[in-house]
Amino acid sequence: MLFSLRNFISYSNLYLYKNVCIGGQLLLNQDEILKKMEEWPKHYNPKEIEEKWQKIWLSEEYWRDVFRFRDEDDKAPRFVIDTPPPFTSGELHMGHAYWVTIADTIGRFKRLEGYNVLLPQGWDTQGLPTELKVQYKLGIPKDNRQLFLQKCIEWTEEMIKKMKEAMIRLGYRPEWERFEYKTYEPKYRKIIQKSLIDMYKMNLIEMREGPVIWCPKCETALAQSEVGYLEKEGILAYIKFPLKEGGEIVIATTRPELLAATQAIAVNPMDERYKNLVGKIALVPIFNIEVKIISDADVEKEFGTGAVMISTYGDPQDIKWQLKYNLPIKVIVDEKGRIINTNGILDGLKIEQARNKMIELLKTKGYLVKVEKIKHNVLSHVERSDCLSPVEFLVKKQIYIKVLDKKQKLLEEYKKMKFKPARMSYYLEDWIKSIEWDWNITRQRIYGTPLPFWYCENGHLVPAKEEDLPIDPIKTSPPLEKCPLCGSELKPVTDVADVWIDSSVTVLYLTKFYEDKNVFNRTFPASLRLQGTDIIRTWLFYTFFRTLMLANNVPFTTVLVNGQVLGPDGTRMSKSKGNVVSPLDRVNDFGADAIRMALLDASIGDDFPFKWDIVKGKKMLLQKLWNASRLVYPFIAKQRLDKPKSLHIVDKWILQEHKKFVTKAINAYENYDFYLVLQELYNYFWEIVADEYLEMIKHRLFDDDNSAKYTIQRIIRDIIILLHPIAPHITEEIYSRLFGHKKSVLLEELPKVDDIEENKRIDELGEVIKKTNSLIRSEKIKNRLSMNTPVSVKLYASKQVIELINEVKDDVMKTLKVTNLELIESNEEKVEIKTANQSMGV
């Protein structure tokens, strides 16, 4: 039921000129009350109010008194949140808006709960996407390394500015003043490099030569966590390999362009078709290379012909076989994805071109049996959605962090972290179990953290001096003239670090692991890691692994993993689908608070569609709260009302409902079930407080009834406090107008409800009130009468119900404009109404 101001204050001529004492002032009539209400705008203007409070929150005064993490405070419990440092793309998408809202909500709730909260915000600044923007959009060549780096930093700062403004517009208030960090800055870079040197000293880092995952499109090495299988269209070529002693064997391959790198043919030892061929020599067609036929249990008999070629390297299985059988290595793909070392047959061609040409050559020479078009899984660069290109395996000298021999320890230690939802722990466990490679941390890029090492031709590493950090080996002389192990000349490592090296030390940076052991001991492990499902195997795993190695403990006690925000059609947002929604598209129409509420309206960990209709519904709820606050404003504003010795029975009922709401809401917050907070708020505030209770107490408010005034003030204040973490702007505004005892809601405490007595009979009374009101309203609607039309009512109900109604008969009558209420005992509950003869209102 929508509030009407005039209906609220004119329910009866009896009260038209009633003197009402409000806040020490005498309001003589409804005109005075109307005038008082006009101090409060009728319509909630989210843009105006939100921008006002965002400016206030950013003031030095509010930072100092409300949002500052108090390093000196040894009494209050600490709550440290490790928030995601987003890559500085410049666009704050809906996924960013989601975790920003979650982080801000948790930070605000924990402050209300009495915690000393550290809510930081960093920026993951370095990496390939920025390089590509600078290289192609700005036209800056990579040849001039210094200029290129400078332009990358300028671009980064420009993007940070845009994203930060968008975050602030959504009401996000981390501690920008002291805990905003950028991964390219010297202070942070020093921590990165120090952590790498420490891991080197722990014998966890080494340089070695071998096959690496390589993205020809991005021209850099990759880690296992950055690749995955994508279904793509391809071919399966059936090729005849002549046998040296006569005869032939037909193999099936998806990579005929790698024939020149073939080192063996493999068949399954249980495959009767090829048992007599194992150990024989076959000739690679076109290239006439002699290779041995071997048997291996990993060959799938059902795939193709059951015979496969082993090349260096077509896929991860080729690498395993090469190591297992100590096969020769021949590299025929370069860093740009072009064919080399084929005696000019395919040299210079890109992979796809070489594949097509090889098919034609095999066909011409009579070696091609057939070609099938297939769909198959291809290992690709999936960590970057704007790449998704197939990867190759090149032989390179790279720097690795040893992970494989720590897998068992990792599988034991991860259980010390609590996951929300609990099922997310299995994603991390499965990833740890699936790791097959050590972590290649070198990237052949420019805009990244320099690896603080020099190396010699034998692959020995020499770390920088810690007092020289942060350093760039390209610009700095090595700490020694020669390699201390072999006496060879030292060269700087020119590659930069994997970007996950940067972001995997966020916890160590925030808790001052290297700077202040006292602070570290009081803030580590962090209380909470907040992140999405898509970076469990990267940011979560690498932070967990590195922190465990360096600090000998898990990085955080709880991991909160949110799902993905989908397009309105329920599919992943994509520009090609046209279903991309920006959080700022309609923020001025509906407000940041309504957007935040819509984003938190799903269970943590679940994917959900974002729809503006849901946002619109949330704004309606906020307008309802605004209206209710405005309506009670003349009666309770800025008053300190003590609990009366005796409460009206209707007030006792609503306080029992209030106790249930407060208890459920706080419990939901504690469990990060924000959707339950909103669900309980709607059920309690909209359906009970606004639609029932406010209607029932208005006559008592005009009577200056302390029980009604105390109760509604307590209810509104507690609702404001409990809604504040999710909808901070409107709650600050209402609080400042209605209460204002403190400069911010955040300086209040969570509501306490232990003093509210619980009585089963009063609960029953409440249910009877709601049902009776509903019956009378329904009859009025059925008879096309307005809610303000005076009526006579006959209510048929059981003896028990009648006894309860008699306790609140006067309240029911005044609430629903009932001039005469006749209670008739009956087994059937129903209502009969007729229009009253006398006027009941203005």
From Swiss-Prot:
A motif ('HIGH' region) lies at residues 86-96. Its EC number is 6.1.1.9. GO terms for biological process: valyl-tRNA aminoacylation. It is an enzyme of class 6 (ligase). GO terms for molecular function: aminoacyl-tRNA deacylase activity; ATP binding; valine-tRNA ligase activity. It is found in: Cytoplasm. It catalyses: tRNA(Val) + L-valine + ATP = L-valyl-tRNA(Val) + AMP + diphosphate. Transmembrane segments: none annotated. A motif ('KMSKS' region) lies at residues 572-576. Keywords: Aminoacyl-tRNA synthetase, ATP-binding, Cytoplasm, Ligase, Nucleotide-binding, Protein biosynthesis. It comes from the Archaea. HAMAP family: Val_tRNA_synth_type2 (MF_02005). Catalyzes the attachment of valine to tRNA(Val). As ValRS can inadvertently accommodate and process structurally similar amino acids such as threonine, to avoid such errors, it has a 'posttransfer' editing activity that hydrolyzes mischarged Thr-tRNA(Val) in a tRNA-dependent manner. This is Valine--tRNA ligase. It comes from Saccharolobus solfataricus (strain ATCC 35092 / DSM 1617 / JCM 11322 / P2) (Sulfolobus solfataricus). The gene is valS.
